[in-house]
């Protein structure tokens, strides 16, 4: 068949098509977003600038300093006693643990001994602080990945502990209870009984919280194999506390470099195996149980140890109220102690405690006056936050809040 209606021949399809102009390749720009500083999962005033390739995190840039108050500089203009309240405002989730480090540093400088009863009360409240911290962290970490009930239960328990704080020193949060040489005042027998009653009931609360989230499929999917830290990495980044114990390193200052009277207590150090967010969560849960054991032992020892809670060294201890009503010298001594303060010998000391978040250290330099020449605060959260970029690379965007939650960051101590 010929003509316009004839079927196409195979050769008709091989004619040269006109060449099209080359399309320039569009450069793909990385996606930058801000996480915080007003973000419910940011655990304080943290600003993260995230660089994303789709859903994959390529870079995390933490911007800190939004809660900087110049604590270390302010301390240089105040007496040692006036500086104790500053430590309550660092890690404000567990205030007394920070006071402890500062008091230990002053006691090292002065060579002052703490009476056994005062030492036991310190241990008791440091462990209450550990429970306060871990309750908040574990339950809000669950909230960060979608659970609503655990934080409600956690805050209910924390409220009971806050009441114990209030009954011991009059303040729910900023305690100002630890003093160089001991603690401010003794505990009443009824308070000791109530703490014991709480400590005996608390393991059941831990079981309830674990029943909600430990084997929860969604919680495990969001935390297992997320934010893995190997032993070598933990040491290289200068981690401490749960961040190293979650990776399987048995390092706890209460056991490795005992201070106060921790040598007299029986407790275990929980260790993780994989170094991921889930292992760190399990470590914190078990640490709360161990702290409860220490609390019960401390209460037993307190009942068997009557005596003073403050050193009898007049250089740092104020006179008793009854004595001030009788003696003019006692009144003058009290006035001088609280206005001028005590003087420390020249020197440098470093004191550290196993705070709930890790090793909290105080490097104190004295020039022989009544005020510190320099006080350098070593906050555990600072080292942990520094690794945020390295820990998040290659993870999904949704994993950022899970990793941040497992680092346990509080900005009072990071920004100081």
From Swiss-Prot:
Reaction(s) catalysed (UniProt annotation): a quinone + NADH + 5 H(+)(in) = a quinol + NAD(+) + 4 H(+)(out)
UniProt KW keywords: Cell inner membrane, Cell membrane, Membrane, NAD, Quinone, Translocase, Transport, Ubiquinone
UniProt keyword Transmembrane, yes or no: no
A GO cellular-component term linked to this record: plasma membrane
EC identifiers of the protein: 7.1.1.-
Gene Ontology MF, one: NAD binding
Chief location: membrane
Topology term for the membrane: Peripheral membrane protein
Cellular localization per UniProt: Cell inner membrane
Its job: NDH-1 shuttles electrons from NADH, via FMN and iron-sulfur (Fe-S) centers, to quinones in the respiratory chain. The immediate electron acceptor for the enzyme in this species is believed to be ubiquinone. Couples the redox reaction to proton translocation (for every two electrons transferred, four hydrogen ions are translocated across the cytoplasmic membrane), and thus conserves the redox energy in a proton gradient.
NCBIfam families, sorted: NuoD (TIGR01962), PRK06075.1 (NF004739)
HAMAP family reported for this sequence: NDH1_NuoD
Subunit structure: NDH-1 is composed of 14 different subunits. Subunits NuoB, C, D, E, F, and G constitute the peripheral sector of the complex.
Descriptive protein name: NADH-quinone oxidoreductase subunit D
Species assigned in the record: Caulobacter sp. (strain K31)
